[in-house]
Amino acid sequence: MIKQALLSVSDKTGIVEFARELNALGVTLLSTGGTAKLLADSGLPVTEVADYTGFPEMLDGRVKTLHPKVHGGILARRDLPEHMAALAEHDIPTIDLLVVNLYPFQQTVAKDDCTLPDAIENIDIGGPTMLRSAAKNHRDVTVIVDPVDYAVVLDEMRANGNKVGYDTNFRLATKVFAHTAQYDGAITNYLTSLGADKSHQARSAYPQTLNLAFEKVQEMRYGENPHQSAAFYRDLKAVDGALANYVQLQGKELSYNNIADADAAWECVKSFAVTTPACVIIKHANPCGVAVGANALEAYDKAFKTDSTSAFGGIIAFNVELDETAAQAVAKQFVEVLIAPSFSAAARAVFASKQNVRLLEIPLGKGINQYDLKRVGGGLLVQSPDAKNVQPTELRVVTRRHPTPKEMDDLMFAWRVAKFVKSNAIVFCGGGMTLGVGAGQMSRVDSARIASIKAQNAGLTLAGSAVASDAFFPFRDGLDVVVDAGATCVIQPGGSMRDDEVIAAADDRGIAMVLTGTRHFRH
């Protein structure tokens, strides 16, 4: 039974209301510093921990709760007579409920003007110590680290005579250990990112020890293949607009491959301006059709035409609300997952009878993940995300013929798509749509040939098309393939030892070529 609670929080959201309800239930309130003042100013009966222990706060508040009367009251096992006898001998009441959240270390070090002393002073000592004590003794002590749990605890107390069940206490304890682990991980990340001069401004993006925190969203029936087990975890630092923030409106549980392909589709479609409706169709993590249009329907129709065969059973993403008209067109095809920032009520009604179709709603966001991660045997490759979008002013025309305004638009579109195609990538585009995509080949020439064949199979002409290559042409052979297919302009990074030969070949063939200076390998 909860008779006495200790409340000491940095995040004071809802703490007064929570304490008021505890007081109404007859719970004695202990508190520290600013929390105690807030509760007292709110008219609540509260005892300062310094008065409770008979020992004053000291060292500028560094020592407040590190006292046997606090930790003894938390750690004592109520089912062990010797523990309870020790409490009685030393006149230590039990503390049955602990509410603590920690100094805002991560928010502090996120500030540009943070100094090492600022960071050090925001490393909480007493808070984690109390939290770990309470979480260890969770059979007897309820511990709250997150204001979202106030209501749950109050409901159980009201329903059970001030008692909280073991299952709830266990869940709250595991939440505490996850929280303190993340907190210590953030401290380690920061301190090991500092250079020899310990300058906050000169710290490395890649700390000597890297701690990452994820929480499980779901376990899956299987992984990439049926013989593999799998689960999906969400990054606790997931940015706005990340796939992990999806809300599933309908459909079966997402599979491992669904999520992998959905991420590829969403990242690609997000790269287009929201003022330009765009549609991306993904199969096996590669775009098989990408287009922009006057509306969602036009964008979808154009994207689907690129490769209607591969689009079967694909993942489709839009960067604008999916309306009824576009939904009706999409519903005619077999689609695994459909993603959009929002779905109109009429669009949702279209899919109501197709419960196997998974509808994911994800708000568009401008945030960029801190890291791009790739697991290798015994290690982890960590890099910054490939977030660079080349602007037309950054392009360098290297041929005698310059692209026309229409060709430049097509080149920019093709370059945007090529970034999301597995290397080696060759993408034919024209009129705001992909015409042929060659992906994942060991030879750039083969990717060019496949892209040309794809367009031919789809009945799409490549005459006057634009081509993007995710990396440089090492020889002129790949260039000749795309020009023979009908391309009149090419965009590529440049940087080959034979750039001069490739540029000369472009001049020989009478096409325009622009260099980006940026490569978009994707493995």
Swiss-Prot record:
Return the Pfam families for the record. AICARFT_IMPCHas, MGS
List cellular component terms (GO). Answer: cytosol
**Which biological processes are named by the entry's GO terms?**
'de novo' IMP biosynthetic process
| Record SMART domains | AICARFT_IMPCHas, MGS
Per its UniProt record, what InterPro entries does this chain match? AICAR_Tfase_dup_dom_sf (IPR024051), Cytidine_deaminase-like (IPR016193), MGS-like_dom (IPR011607), MGS-like_dom_sf (IPR036914), PurH-like (IPR002695)
Could you tell me which residue ranges the MGS-like domain spans?
Answer: 1-145
Instruction: Give the enzyme's EC designation.
Output: 2.1.2.3, 3.5.4.10
Q: Which residues cross the membrane?
A: none
About its domains, the entry says: The IMP cyclohydrolase activity resides in the N-terminal region.
Instruction: Indicate what this protein is called per its UniProt record.
Output: Bifunctional purine biosynthesis protein PurH
Question: Which organism was this protein described from?
Answer: Cupriavidus pinatubonensis (strain JMP 134 / LMG 1197)
Question: What gene is this protein translated from?
Answer: purH
